[in-house]
């Protein structure tokens, strides 16, 4: 018997609500990183839709690199200084939750799938605000990376 699982739109709206509750939406920048083989662009686009379901203006941008200075100058600073009021920028790319880069994000999401899953206490997973399993992309699951 097949198990019920929430649709992608429902999961991403719930993740957006979690981010809203934790860090707010006043020019908030979110980082989305993940293991090889995950579609970070799809996840970022779905998260934009999740924020929009809550009435929050959001947009996604691909990271030009995982270099902290370049990310700050090309994406983070222009977003934070060019507008006023609520708005969320979701930056997606490999390596953007690495040590030294992760401090750019007010909230972050690590994306993985069953094959190649990182250990529960892997540094990048510990640093992420949330973990998303996209083994079934139509029904992604929020994972709880706790030690309980």
Regions found by a protein language model. Name each.
Residues 33-37, 63-65, 92-94, 112-113, ...:
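Structural motif
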Residues 3-4, 54-100:
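Conserved nucleotide-sensing/catalytic segment adjacent to the nucleotide-binding pocket
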Residues 23-25, 81-86, 102-103, 125-126:
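Flexible, charged surface loops at secondary-structure boundaries
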Residues 27-31, 87-90:
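Residue-level preference for the first positions of well-ordered beta-strands
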Residues 30-49:
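Glycine-rich phosphate-binding P-loop
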Residues 9-24:
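Pre-Walker A adenine-sensing motif
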Residues 1, 19-21, 32:
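N-terminal membrane-targeting/anchoring modules of bacterial envelope and secretion proteins
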Residues 1-9, 29, 95-96, 101-148:
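Conserved NTP phosphate-binding and transfer environment spanning the P-loop NTPase/kinase superfamily
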């Amino acid at each position: 018997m097949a198990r019920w699982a929430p649709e992608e739109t429902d999961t991403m709206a719930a993740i957006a609500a979690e981010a809203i509750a934790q860090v707010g939406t006043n020019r908030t920048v979110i980082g989305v990183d993940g293991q090889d083989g995950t579609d970070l662009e799809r996840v970022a686009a779905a998260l934009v839709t999740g924020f929009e379901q809550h009435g929050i203006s959001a947009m996604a941008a691909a990271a030009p690199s995982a270099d902290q200075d370049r990310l700050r100058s090309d994406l983070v600073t222009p977003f934070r200084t060019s507008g006023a009021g609520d708005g969320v920028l979701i930056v997606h790319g490999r390596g953007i939750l690495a040590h030294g880069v992760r401090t750019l994000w007010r909230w972050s999401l690590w994306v993985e799938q069953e094959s190649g899953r990182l250990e529960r206490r892997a540094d990048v997973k510990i640093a992420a605000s949330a973990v998303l399993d996209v083994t079934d992309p139509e029904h992604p699951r929020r994972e709880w990376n706790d030690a309980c």
